[in-house]
Structure formats: C-alpha cells, structure tokens
Amino acid sequence: MGRMFGTDGVRGVANKELTADLAYKLGKAGAFILTEGAHRPKILVGMDTRISGDMLESALVAGILSVGAEAICVGVIPTPAIAYLTRKYNADAGVVISASHNPVEYNGIKFFNKNGYKLSDELEDSIQALIKDDFKGVPVLTGENIGRKIEEDGEAIRDYIDFAKSTIKGDLKGLKVALDCANGASYITSVEAFKELGAEVHVINNKPDGININRNSGSTHPEDLMEYVVKNNCHMGLAFDGDADRCLAIDEKGNLINGDFILAICGKELKKQGRLKKNTIVVTVMSNLGLDIAMKKEEINTIKTKVGDRYVLEEMLKNDYAIGGEQSGHIIFSDYNTTGDGLVTALQLAHIVKERGKTFSELCSIMKELPQVLVNAKVPNDQKDIYLKDEEIKSEIDTITKNLDGSGRVLIRPSGTEPLVRVMLEGENQEEIDKLAHSLAKLIENKVK
C-alpha cells in the first residue's frame, strides 16, 4: 500500500477510489488515534456541497461511532470553519469531507487535530498503519459504549460567521462587492457575513445542486466574475473555491488579483498597524519575484518555503509570523485561524479597500508582476537531480542568473508525481526568458538521453 494521505488529506474519485468502505476505515482509525485517552471523545464533521458527501459522511460517521466517539455533524460548511470550531467547541478532532477546488467526481477526507491544525505526517502514518493492520488492538465496543451522532442545527454556521466578522473593526458600508461562491461551501457564510457588515452584496454561483461545485466558477474559473464586476460597477470581486479555504480577488477594472498581490496589500497594512511580526511575510518559492521587490521597498522581509500551504504554516508557527500564503489564494492569518481561510482573507481585503479610500486597482499598484515562463523537461524519475550534479547545466543556470542581474530568477523544481523537471524563469522581458527557459529545458533533456 502506497501512502494514502496526500498533501491535503485522502483524495480520490468518490465511490471508486474513495469508497464508503475506506471512509468507514478512516473514520474508525482517525477517531481512535486522535482521541486516545479521552473519556467520550467529540469529533466535528463538516462537508462541502458535493453529491457524494452524504454517502461518505454516513460511512465516516459509522466508523467514528464504532470506536465510541461522538460525531457532531454540522453539514455543509467551509473547511476553515471546522478548523476554528474544533477549537471553539473543545472537540477532540475535526474532519472535513471535501476535495476543495477539484471537479465534482472527486472527494476527500481531511482531519484536523484538537487545536485546529492539519495532521502531521506521523499521525497520518499512524492512521494508515492501523487500517493496514486491520485494526489490531482496537476493542470492539457494544451496548452503551458505542458513540452517538448529533445533528447540529445551524449554530455552527452562525458561530463561524460571527468569528469571521470579528476579524475586522467597523463595517463595510458603502462598499459594492461581488462574490463568486463556486456553488460550494461558502454559499451561505460569505454572503451573510458581507451583508451583515453593511456591504452591498452581489452574488453569483451560490445555488449548489450537488453537481455544480467549481463548475466554470470560483477561484479556479474567475472569468464570469471578472466580467460581472465591470458590468455592475462593483468596487471589487471575491472568488472562493469549493471548500472556501482560498480566495482570489478582482479589481474594479476586472483584473484578476492573485495571492501574491493579496499578501503584499495585507502585509503592508499589518505593518502599518504594527501587527506584522518581525516585519516578515511567508511565501513559497513559486511566488513572483515582483512580490519580493515590492516588499523590499516597504522594508518587509519575505521568507520562502516549499510549495504547499502546510509548509507555509510550518514556517509561520516556527517563528511566530502573522501572515503567509500562496499565489493560489491560500492565505493564512495566524492571529485568526490555523489554516487558509477564504472568508477571513476576503474581509481583510474589503476592509482595507474601504479604510484606505483608494480604488482596489490603486492598492494593487504596490506590486508589479514580472513575466513568468514555465517549461517542463522530461526526465526519468531516477535522474531528477541532474540539474544539481551536471557541471554544464549548473554553469548555464549561473550564467542566466548573472545576466538577469537581480531583476529575474531561475527556479528548477522536480515534479513530485511525474517524470518531469519544471524549469521556471522570471524576468522583465517575456521573449527573452521564454527563449532561455526552453533552451535550458532542452539542455536538461539532452543530458539524460
């Protein structure tokens, strides 16, 4: 059995790879491992709007109850809400049934520990080992020792909305905002939060039917929202993904504003408020060099991690940083939540637009995005480190870096899943970096022939 857990829990095509049987086993093993020692453990369960959610929830909950834990089912709710509410309700763990931005046929199961953090690799491995060993050593409970399922009646959604609203001071009166809910988990929470804060709210893609989640909508397909914002003269647009742990924005001119710009704007604002700990933001190696240049001008440091919000969070926790995130719109505000939170991000941005009295596009001028080129070089899995060993390749990378002279960069990343090495170049001249990236990729391919 290969590793069951990916970078974001267990994912697969529902009923084919992620079966009801596997969901039952994950519920049973997860509840047992995460609640050892608790008298009558409590586990919070939420999901996004996918049709397969009901099937997987039933199986997952059966597994949880079989080891004597209580399952508190809160229904459709954003992933970051489960992270927050697990802490608020003093639950022993939280579980979300969601495949985030993936198409409807996929689903996933993701655990949070009692502090609202995603599980460490070690805990995930313990859960997998227990399943592999066919639950050896896990007692079979009967009678009064079996757990109960508790259906929650809407209080969880209310608590999460109140929490999200509390992350900004004042209101959003006078702001005209368009929201794209991706027919996903934020279709109630984001709309209510913005309305209750006094914004004029326009909404698209907030009628989930079980199969339209992420379909030509949300943060992975923001084209309709870009058009809508301009047509309806909105001050800004905000696009969530299926489980609302990420958010991208649209300025009043219809331009897409990615996570790099959001980090730049929010980082500057936090610094102004004296809340940017150690004057540092945490980003990944894929963040545009334009962000580094912009932050240098603001006297803000950027620390880079591997790609993946879990690595961003790891770095933030290690050094107590206040904000970090990815281009994709996964933004973590450690003062507020333990994971990327689309609604919290959206509210921070909207609040800055209102408070600063500038248009959103003016705020975005803080940063100039450098052209970026990504070329894949086909390389056998056992030779993916050739760019670190071969002298000619190393020399070519050094030459390109020298010629870019601080206004560009070369980044080589082996793919974690395919026989590829990704060659990424950034610089001021699109044509030039395009040529350089292709010739470097070709050199790498020729070396492994």
From Swiss-Prot:
Keyword Nucleotide-binding listed? The answer is no
Cofactor annotation comment: Binds 1 Mg(2+) ion per subunit.
Q: Which UniProt keywords apply?
A: Isomerase, Magnesium, Metal-binding, Phosphoprotein
Write one Gene Ontology MF term: phosphoglucosamine mutase activity
Annotated Pfam families: PGM_PMM_I (PF02878), PGM_PMM_II (PF02879), PGM_PMM_III (PF02880), PGM_PMM_IV (PF00408)
For this protein, what is the EC number? 5.4.2.10
Identify one Gene Ontology CC term for this UniProt entry.
cytosol
What modifications does the entry list under PTM / processing? Activated by phosphorylation.
**Residues that hold Mg(2+) according to the record:** 100, 241, 243, 245
Give the protein's cofactors: Mg(2+)
The record, for SUPFAM superfamilies, names:
Phosphoglucomutase, C-terminal domain, Phosphoglucomutase, first 3 domains
Tell me the GO BP annotations in alphabetical order: carbohydrate metabolic process; peptidoglycan biosynthetic process; UDP-N-acetylglucosamine biosynthetic process
Q: Which residues form the active site?
A: 100 (phosphoserine intermediate)
Quickly give the catalysed reaction: alpha-D-glucosamine 1-phosphate = D-glucosamine 6-phosphate
Spell out the HAMAP family in the cross-references.
GlmM_B
Q: What does this protein do?
A: Catalyzes the conversion of glucosamine-6-phosphate to glucosamine-1-phosphate.
Designated name of the protein? Phosphoglucosamine mutase
Annotated source species: Clostridium botulinum (strain 657 / Type Ba4)
